[in-house]
Amino acid sequence: MNLHHGAATASEARGPMPGRLGAAPPRLGNVNFHEVTIRLGARAQPRLILDRISLDIPSGQFVCVLGPSGCGKSTLLNALAGFVTPSGGRIAVDGDTITTPGADRGVVFQDPTLFPWKTVLANVSLGPLLAGVASDEAERIGRKLLGRVGLSSRCESFPKHLSGGMQQRVGIARALANNPRVLLMDEPFGALDAQTRSMMQHVLLDVWAEVGVTVLFVTHDIDEAVTLGDRILIMSASPGRIIDDIVVPIARPRADDVMFLAEFNHIKRRCFDHIRRESISAFAQQHEV
């Protein structure tokens, strides 16, 4: 089942947004999952985690993924990152089959995992350096990205001197440093307080609007998904399947009071009903006698 109805609508409404890191070529980032199945665990009795996922994400679109705990949201993201190999089916970015991690896909986790012995600038510049970029150009890229996330004044700071929100901003800048076509985010704001989370959402949307990268964003927070996404994918209880694909037609840029719109709350209720039903199903599965 290929659930991408209406997918181009939100993306086309925004128009194309090529990458703008100077010499970098225009960014694509069209993502395709075709009948992707993933089984994990002991070889004798592998557990079915994802069941025949088919999905198209056009370049530059911001897609959020919601579902009950244990449904395979992170596995879906890790498969696109190249960290998990599908048992069946195919994952591709711009037609190229994904088999391993690559610089064309940047990843941001809930824990920023910065190198504590390196400065903020050195953390962000490391990716380009490892890719063979000259040190002065890598530093230029790092400074530009840190400016985009509002940390120009903290280039020479060490991670231990930054708040959780600041560290996550560094993590976003680092993930973008190699000019990826796709940005993968696994509950990146889950450990932050409500005010910092809201601020980080605005930072992310500003950077995304400027850079134009395709985003796949995993979250447990329905409000966050509706605030950020062009689309919201709802996953079933394990094994994970996509049971709804919701286009969010709210115009961008989205105001601070977007959550008070009737359309926002209509989508929120639709998501809530799905998550509640699937969470009950997951609970029942876990407590079967």
Question: Residue locations for each model-derived region?
Answer:
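Non-catalytic connector elements of ABC transporters
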Residues: 1-15, 19, 258-289
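ABC family nucleotide-binding domain
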Residues: 15, 19-223, 228
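Active-site/binding-pocket entry motifs
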Residues: 39, 251-253, 277, 281
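Short hydrophobic beta-strand elements within the C-terminal catalytic ATPase subdomain
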Residues: 93, 234-235
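A generic structural signal for secondary-structure junctions
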Residues: 129, 247-251, 276
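Conserved catalytic segment of ABC-fold P-loop ATPases
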Residues: 228-234
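Conserved beta-strand-loop-alpha-helix hinge in the C-terminal portion
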Residues: 235-270
